[in-house]
Amino acid sequence: TTLFRSSFHTGKRAHIKMNATYNPNATGKNILGMIKGSDPILCNEYVIISAHLDHLGMIPFLIEGANDNNSSSAAMLGVAEALAKSKIKPKRSIIFMSVDGEEAGLTGSTYYTNHPLVPKDKVIAILNLEQVGVGQMLGANYHYKYPELAKLSQKANAMYVHRRLFTNETHFLTRPRTDGAVFMKAGYPCIDLWALGSGYYHHPKDNIRSINPDILRAATEWLYWTTIFIANK
């Protein structure tokens, strides 16, 4: 089979005009909460769970974003509730961060890396969630400098979740397309967690009817145990 690039030089130059509204006073909000670690010393180290809370909105019809990225927000909040009630107490503190402005150019994650609320060297991992509500298998993307994060996520899956898991080691970073890439580029130990499968992307049909509850539940359990293993290592 011969593969051809889908992009090519046409030799033409195009000029595009568009009407847009610019609001210099527009603001976004990152929302953070924390469960303090149980160890008197290790509680001063942090595991951050992040998921962007925004989507496209009206363009001009409603793009609900059930998978991208409400599924991740639901998983993060589910883990926050489970950890708060669990008898297994994380030794390190867990920060839950709902990041704004991902679809508007990764503005929320970029803002956090420039204005961190806890010392960067005290963050032992960022677990960034992206689209965990559609598909049949789990995926993890991690920077090659932090293979232990992938190993702990694999351990969590093997012991408690038992789903097919694809892991990808990243050796270089190009133009960031996810908050996880922003955190990696800023030097944070970060792993992107997602679910793999064909779903609607930036499409009106990315709604609640497209969500697979089974994979969303599996991703939430996977996040829970991965967080426990990292926080207590």
Please tell me what each predicted stretch does.
Residues 1-65, 81, 85-86:
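Soluble metallo-hydrolase cores and metallopeptidase-like ectodomains found primarily
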Residues 80-94, 119-121:
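Phosphate-handling active-site elements
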